Amino acid sequence: MDKAQHTQGKCPVAHGGNTTVASDVMEWWPNALNLDILHQHDNKTNPMDPNFDYREAFKSLDLSAVKQDLRALMTDSKDWWPADWGHYGGLMIRMAWHSAGTYRMADGRGGAGTGNQRFAPLNSWPDNANLDKARRLLWPIKKKYGNKLSWADLIILAGTIAYESMGLKTFGFAGGRADIWHPEKDIYWGSEKQWLAASDAENSRYSGQRDLENPLAAVMMGLIYVNPEGVDGQPDPLKTAQDIRVTFERMAMNDEETVALTAGGHTVGKCHGNGRAENLEAAPEGAELEDQGLGWLNKTSRGIGRDTVTSGIEGAWTTHPTQWDNGYFELLLNYDWELKKSPAGAWQWQPINIKEEHKPVDVEDPSIRLSPIMTDADMAMKMDPEYRKISDRFYQDPAYFSEVFARAWFKLTHRDLGPKSRYLGTDVPAEELIWQDPIPQVDYSLTEQEVTDIKAKILASGLSIAQLVATAWDSARTFRGSDFRGGANGARIRLAPQKDWQGNEPARLQKVLAVLATIQAGLTKSVSIADLIVLGGTAAVEKAAHAAGVHVKVPFAAGRGDSTLAQTDVESFDVLEPLHDAFRNWQKKDYVVQPEEMMLDRTQLMGLTAHEMTVLVGGMRVLGANYDNSKHGVFTDNVGVLSNDFFVNLTDMSYNWKPAGKNLYHIVDRSTDKVKWTATRVDLVFGSNSILRSYAEIYAQDDAKEKFVNDFVKTWTKVMNADRFDLM
C-alpha cells in the first residue's frame, strides 16, 4: 500500500490537540486535587479588551431606550417561534426566573449575576427547555446595544419589563452584572449521573428522611426548583409543599415570599405539553451543527405555538394569561381540582365544572376556550395550612399581593448582585433593604500621617502580630465573590452571629476589639472599627515584613463603615460562618470532604487564584496566625517574621513526612529521626500536588525573599479590599 494513501476513516492530519472531553488528566488520576475551579475565568477566554470595564460601559447605556425596545419586543410575534396570545411576556419571565432561580444561599453560587444560562449545563437543563428561543428573540436588542448591555442584565431586565407590560408595577431594576465567557466549574449541581433522577436513584441528593444535600436547593438534577408533577413525579401537594419550603428557604425566601413568587410567576404565561416529548431533538449542547445552538427542535411535527412541548404539562393557570391580575387565586381557591394527564403524559390538576368564561382562550384561536391547569406546586399553595393562610390574604387583598410579589421578584433577581453600592442605573429603588446587608457610609478621610500615627498606636497597644493578623483575616474572610456578601466592611465580626462563631475565637476576638475600641475613643477624628481592624492587620504585616528585612508599605484605604445589629439579618449571616479555614489551619470538625478540597472551595469563593492561595498559606503560617495558636504547619523558628521559611522547609529533602493520625503528619529529620514539625493535609498538599509544588518551589528559592513578601502583601490587600466596591 502506498504510504501516501490513508485507510478510510482515519484522519490524515497529525494533530495532538485534545479537542474532546476524553483522556482528561483527572480521568487517569481521579483522586488528584483538581485546581480547575481556581483557574476557570482566565482572561484568555475573555474576548473583551483588557481595559474594558462593563460597569463603566453600562453607565453610558440609554436604559429608557432599552426598555422601550423590550416593550415592543413583547408583542412582536415571530413566525419561527410565535408568541402565546401574541405576547412573549410569559416566556421572558420564565427565562429571567430560571436565570435567577439557581441561586442558593448556602454558598451564594448560581443566580443571575453572570449570564451563565448561555452555557452548559444550564443551557441544556430539562427545566430550561426552549429558553434558548427566548434568548434568540432578545438577540437583536443585545446586538443593538452591544457591550453596554450584558446578557446577564438583559435577561433580568427582559423579565421585569415583561411584568410591567402586563400591568404590574415593579419595584425596580439594577444593572451591573458582567458576563462570563465559558461554563462555570465551581458550582456543584449534584452528583446524579442522569437528568431528573428520582430521590432513590444512585448518587441521590437525598438521605435520611428526605434530607436534601447541602448546598443544593433544587430537588432534582436539571430542575430549577421542585418537580411540578409532584415528589419524584408522584402528585401529592402536601409532600410537594415540604420540598417547596426547603427549596425556597435555601434561596433565602420566607413563606410569604414563596407564595407570592409561585402565584406571581403563574399569574401569566402557560405550560407547554401539547405533543409527544419523544419527538423533540437533543438539547442545545447535543444538537446538530446546523441547528446553530438551538435545542429541543421538533422535526417530525409542527412543534410551535399551540403544539409546543416544554415541561409536558399543558395549559395556562389563569383566565387572562397576558394580564397581571388576581386570577390565579380566584381559580385556585374557588374551584375543586382533579388529577389529569396532559397530552404529553404529565400529571396536572384541572378544575371540576369550571365556568366557560373562566377558561383561557387558545394561544392561536381566541374562539376556542380550554381548561386552565395547576401543577402540584400550585396545589400546595392551597392545601398546605401555612401557605393557604397566605394565599387567602393575597386573594382578599390584591394590592398587597402585588406589592409583596414586586418586592420578592426584585429580591429574587438581585439577591446575588451584592450590596446596594453595586447597583447601577436609573431604576434603582431608594429604599434600603436588610437583605442587601446595608453598611453606613463614612464621612471622614485619613491623611498618610494619620494612618501612620494610628498604626503606631495599635502596635504599641500590646496586641501581638498574630492577634492583629488573625482578627483582620477573620473579619475579611467571609467575603464571597459568588454573591458579594461578607467581608471586612461593616465590621459585622463584632455583632451576632459572627462574634460568637467558633472559628473567630470569641475570647481572643473580644480582647482585640476592646483594645481597638480604646484606641478609637482616644483618636481626635472619628474612625470606624472596621477600618481599625484592617489597619491593625496592615500594621502587623508591615512589622513582620520589616523583621524579615523587606521594607514594604502595605496599602490601606480608609472608608469602611460600622453596621449595626438593626442592619443585620442575623439568620441570613449564619450561612457565612466558616466551618473550615485552611489559611488558619482549622476546621470545626471532621468532614467527608478532604480539607484540601474545602480549601479550594473557600479560595474560589474569596476570588483568589492558586498561586495567591499558596502565598497566603505560607505567610499566614510564619505569622503565627493559626487557630488557637496551633503549631501545625508553622515551619519556622522565627514566628512573626514574614519569611519564606514555610516553603524552604516544606521542599527540603532533609525531612520526610509521616502520618501521625487523622489529618496529622510529622515532619521528621532524616538524620536524627526526630520530629521537627507537625502538619496537616492543607500544609503538605503544597508539596504533594504538582501544580502547588511548582508555586512552593518559586517561593522557596534563594532569590524569593522579596518576591514572597511583595506577593503576600498584594494578596493580603486584595482580601482586605475584596468588598470595597467603592474602590473598584
From Swiss-Prot:
There is a cross-link at residues 97-225 (Tryptophyl-tyrosyl-methioninium (Trp-Tyr) (with M-251)). Its EC number is 1.11.1.21. GO terms for molecular function: catalase activity; heme binding; metal ion binding. Coiled coil: none annotated. Binds 1 heme b (iron(II)-protoporphyrin IX) group per dimer. Residues 1-16 form the signal peptide. Gene3D superfamilies: 1.10.520.10, Peroxidase, domain 2. Disulfide bonds: none annotated. One of its GO terms (biological process) is hydrogen peroxide catabolic process. There is a cross-link at residues 225-251 (Tryptophyl-tyrosyl-methioninium (Tyr-Met) (with W-97)). The record marks 94 as: Transition state stabilizer. Keywords: Heme, Hydrogen peroxide, Iron, Metal-binding, Oxidoreductase, Peroxidase, Signal. GO terms for cellular component: cytosol. Pfam families: peroxidase. Homodimer or homotetramer. Bifunctional enzyme with both catalase and broad-spectrum peroxidase activity. HAMAP family: Catal_peroxid. Belongs to the peroxidase family. Peroxidase/catalase subfamily. This is Catalase-peroxidase 1. It comes from Shewanella frigidimarina (strain NCIMB 400). The gene is katG1.
